[in-house]
UniProtKB/Swiss-Prot annotation:
Protein name: Homoserine O-acetyltransferase
Record Gene3D superfamilies: 3.40.50.880
Entry EC number(s): 2.3.1.31
Name of the gene this protein is made from: metAA
Source species: Thermoplasmatales archaeon (strain BRNA1)
Similarity annotation: Belongs to the MetA family.
Length: 307
């Protein structure tokens, strides 16, 4: 089944060229079906690339999904025009009076500064508070996961001596969580971050459960007690060459980055990387949509947040 997007969203054309089922707004309006209503709060500077990456994963399920892109009103983007954002993105004021099945909060390249110094931090906190009663399940990605764990549970982030960049093996700590259903005993996905959350801090909170870890990358996936919040510390949504782009970008900035771990064949940046996490990403996003949302969300969205 498709995701529904605005008629002229550029990401839709890219996804259609990949033979993914994208339903334009005008066709979707004729469907008599209860689709899932998902918000994507896109905090990444690479807006269009992130749209494509997230929507590619959302579209690969049997469920029909309406996607609403959300921008921060208190932040001025340096990498895309406000005209584009106004055309394709909603503001919080435009979505806050509705209930939603799911919310995805992406990462952002701001982990080296304190949360309170992020210019849109207050607005993000308002959105995260609102999500507790108005969204059935929220997925937080990378810095979004760190922000959510800090805001909701007081879990701090810590600076790393070296950027955590690469594709790392993870293992499940639980055998029966639906989010990991179908995953291999060892499953890989990328990390790209300068800070980390630590297991010892998370384990102090009885309302949080670590369900996947990596010996190299640390905490991988955390869920809340009721599984209405998911925190993924890496970037499953990344394309095959995203880490390569970031590596060469940092080289160009004179930052002397380490070659991403377990990524380029023979650690040779001149060779094209293999994408070893595609199935993991599709499984976990699909499981989140199916088991965490579709199987449990109320048919009447107005009932979201009611005990």
């Amino acid at each position: 089944m498709p995701i529904k997007v605005p008629n002229d969203l550029p990401a839709a054309t890219v996804l259609e060229e990949e033979n993914l089922f994208v339903m334009r707004q005008d066709r979707a309006d004729t469907q008599d079906i209860r689709p899932l209503e998902i918000i994507v709060l896109n905090l990444m500077p690479t807006k269009v690339e992130t749209e494509i990456q997230i929507m590619r994963l959302l579209s690969n399920t049997p469920l029909q999904i309406n996607v609403t892109l959300l921008q921060m009103s208190t932040h001025v983007s340096k990498n895309i025009s406000q005209e584009y954002l106004d055309k394709f993105y909603a503001t919080f004021d435009e979505v806050k009076d509705r209930k939603w099945d799911g919310l995805i909060i992406t990462g952002a390249p701001v982990e080296n500064i304190d949360f309170s110094e992020v210019d849109y931090w207050d607005e993000l906190c308002e959105i995260m508070d609102w999500s507790v009663k108005n969204v059935f399940s929220t997925m937080h990605i990378c810095w979004g996961a760190q922000a959510g764990l800090y805001h909701h549970y007081g879990v701090d982030k810590y600076p790393l001596e070296e950027k955590m960049s690469g594709v790392f093996p993870h293992r499940a700590l639980v055998g029966d969580d639906p989010l990991l259903r179908g995953c291999d005993d060892v499953f890989w996905f990328p990390h790209s971050r300068h800070t980390e959350v630590r297991a010892r801090d998370i384990l102090k909170n009885p309302h949080l459960h670590i369900i996947a870890v990596s010996d190299e990358a640390g905490v991988g996936i955390v869920i809340s007690e009721k599984a209405n919040q998911v925190f993924i510390t890496g970037h499953m949504e990344y394309d095959a060459k995203t880490l390569s782009y970031e590596y060469y970008r940092d080289l160009g900035r004179g930052m002397n980055p380490h070659v991403p771990y377990h990524y380029f064949p023979d650690d040779d940046p001149s060779r094209d990387p293999l994408m070893t996490w595609r199935s993991t990403a599709n499984l976990i996003f699909g499981n989140w949509l199916n088991y965490y949302i579709y199987q449990n969300t109320p048919f009447d969205l107005n009932d979201v947040g009611k005990e």
